[in-house]
């Protein structure tokens, strides 16, 4: 029997949308569950990028910091990435065109997938969510997020593809973060163009959904689920 690949998700994107930003899991604990992934930091201070078992923070001032094990996160998703499909992208395409090609390799539409794209990007457009106090709705914070575009940059996109039925737990479709080859630029991917690269698609067999069970704010939060889903559509 082949080894089971488990996606570990700490907290839900819906809780993040509601303004629950306090970090309650350490990077050290998170990395026990996977070597590739995405998330955010305490007080939603930038974007979390997990690549090859190391964690990085893309900050709003356009800097990248490698994170120590004691730093805490309010939300993250990581997986021990194992490529099931690998293909070369040898001509220029947009993000949407590449995503269509990726999905052509899926066996059905109801399983999570891990995504890793390494290559050269004529355009990479990202954002970094700015630091905010808990209680402020994520969609409101995102209206003032810094965005940056770099041209002819080499690096890696990491992320998760989520089935529609799990929208709210995460964002349905692609949730992708980028980090440059020299670890000086990165963030939450908004759009890109790639002209040469390698795409890896990993199968995910199980979802391990973990919750901040010691966090009273989470335990007693009164969440408007339909409103949160709409906020995810706007912010992500």
From Swiss-Prot:
Matches recorded under Pfam families: AAL_decarboxy
Keywords: Acetoin biosynthesis, Decarboxylase, Lyase
ATP-binding keyword on record: no
Catalytic activity: (2S)-2-acetolactate + H(+) = (R)-acetoin + CO2
Pathway stated in the Swiss-Prot or TrEMBL entry: Polyol metabolism; (R,R)-butane-2,3-diol biosynthesis; (R,R)-butane-2,3-diol from pyruvate: step 2/3
Gene3D superfamilies from the UniProt entry: Hypothetical protein, similar to alpha- acetolactate decarboxylase, domain 2
GO BP terms, alphabetized: acetoin biosynthetic process
GO molecular function, one term: acetolactate decarboxylase activity
Entry EC number(s): 4.1.1.5
CDD domains: acetolactate_decarboxylase
Membership in a protein family: Belongs to the alpha-acetolactate decarboxylase family.
Family matches, as NCBIfam families: acetolac_decarb
Role played: Converts acetolactate into acetoin.
The protein, known as: Alpha-acetolactate decarboxylase
Species for this entry: Lactococcus lactis subsp. cremoris (strain MG1363)
């Amino acid at each position: 029997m082949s080894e089971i690949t488990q996606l570990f998700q700490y907290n839900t994107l819906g809780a993040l949308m509601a303004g629950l930003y306090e970090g309650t899991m350490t990077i050290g604990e998170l990395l026990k569950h996977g070597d590739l992934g995405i998330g955010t930091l305490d007080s939603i201070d930038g974007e979390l990028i997990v690549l090859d078992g190391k964690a990085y923070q893309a900050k709003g001032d356009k800097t990248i910091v490698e994170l120590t094990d004691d730093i805490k996160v309010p939300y993250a998703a990581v997986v021990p990435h194992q490529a099931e499909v690998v293909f070369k992208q040898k001509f220029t395409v947009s993000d949407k065109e590449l995503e269509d090609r990726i999905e052509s390799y899926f066996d059905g539409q109801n399983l999570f997938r891990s995504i890793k794209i390494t290559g050269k990007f004529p355009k990479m457009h990202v954002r970094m969510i700015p630091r905010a106090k808990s209680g402020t709705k994520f969609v409101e914070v995102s209206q003032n997020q810094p965005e940056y575009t770099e041209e002819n940059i080499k690096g890696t996109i990491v992320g998760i593809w989520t089935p529609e039925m799990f929208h709210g737990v995460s964002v349905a479709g692609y949730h992708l973060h980028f980090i440059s080859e020299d670890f000086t630029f990165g963030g939450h991917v908004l759009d890109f163009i790639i002209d040469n690269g390698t795409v890896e698609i990993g199968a995910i067999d199980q979802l391990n959904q973990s919750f901040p069970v010691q966090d009273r704010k989470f335990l007693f939060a009164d969440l408007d689920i339909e409103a949160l889903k709409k906020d995810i559509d706007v912010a992500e």
